[in-house]
């Protein structure tokens, strides 16, 4: 369970936040976006996430965490795939604020914390700490992986 949590934290935070700035130059040159607009995408993302956290948090107390995480992973994957079709700032913003926000809250920090706290009676804090390593680890690894792939396959395929 701890490794699953680590992998989910790595994926959700890594792709949305640590890989995104690496792609900025391509979005600026190809789609004419500004750095300010791209920065606001990440900032605005937290508005629906904050609202959804209350709703999803309550639902996680009633329903299966595993099912929420699986559905969230599918939604998140659809959101990442959808990014390859963006053609404007507004399409990027829409995907981040809807599909990615919903998918990430269903499989990210909130769900991971619930999953681990349900699994461990003792040492839950340690288990949560180990899972949280995925966040930092993704910040080191993903930019190093994504950057060379951009030149190799293009930003829409990364």
Feature locations, PLM:
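Extracytoplasmic
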Residues: 1-35, 53-56, 142-143
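Juxtamembrane helix-start elements in MFS-like secondary transporters
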Residues: 33-42, 128
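Short hydrophobic/small-residue motifs within alpha-helical transmembrane segments
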Residues: 45-47, 136-137
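Conserved MFS/SLC helix-loop-helix module at the cytosolic interface between two early adjacent transmembrane helices
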Residues: 51-90
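Short hydrophobic/alpha-helical segments at membrane-entry points of transmembrane helices
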Residues: 90-96
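Cytoplasmic helix-loop-helix junction between adjacent transmembrane helices
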Residues: 96-133
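Helix-loop-helix hairpin linking two adjacent transmembrane segments in secondary transporters
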Residues: 122, 130-158
């Amino acid at each position: 369970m701890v490794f699953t949590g680590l992998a989910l934290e790595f994926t959700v935070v890594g792709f949305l936040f640590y890989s995104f700035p690496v792609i900025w130059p391509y979005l600026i040159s190809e789609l004419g976006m500004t750095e300010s607009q791209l920065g606001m995408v990440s900032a605005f993302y937290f508005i629906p996430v904050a609202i959804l956290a209350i709703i999803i948090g309550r639902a996680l107390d009633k329903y299966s965490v595993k099912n929420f995480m699986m559905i969230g992973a599918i939604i998140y994957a659809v959101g990442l795939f959808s990014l390859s079709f963006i053609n404007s700032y507004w399409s990027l913003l829409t995907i981040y604020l809807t599909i990615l926000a919903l998918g990430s809250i269903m499989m990210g920090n909130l769900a991971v914390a619930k999953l681990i706290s349900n699994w461990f009676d003792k040492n839950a804090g340690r288990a949560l700490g180990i899972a949280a390593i995925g966040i930092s680890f993704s910040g080191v690894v993903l930019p190093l992986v994504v950057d060379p792939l951009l030149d190799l396959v293009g930003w829409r395929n990364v």
